[in-house]
Amino acid sequence: MKRDNMVRLTRFKVIEKRRQVEQLELMQEDFSRMAAELDAQILNEEKKSGITDINHFAYSTFAKAARLRRDNLQNSAKDLKVQINAARLSLEEAEAELENAEKMEQRDSQRDEHEPRRATA
């Protein structure tokens, strides 16, 4: 029974690690999507104003702010990529731990099945 609890605990860890990876991946996708939307807004604003040089004195303040937000989102997406890789490694470790726990439980259950036969024989 002790092994059964260990298997359930490690299974729970694996599920939680998968959820974390999925959540980080969704966040990264959202950041990338929002950055792409900002790119489109920047292009639209530059097209409206006719000024594409960010150093020009009359460059749109909205476009400057959108560029800054886009750059921040892109940096955050890069940071998330590092976190995703770390979370995937953690998930792989948890899956290996689960596999070992399941094997140990299986061996224990097989041993428990064979022991009563030996005792009666």
Model regions: which residues?
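Charge-rich amphipathic alpha-helical interaction elements
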Residues: 1-121
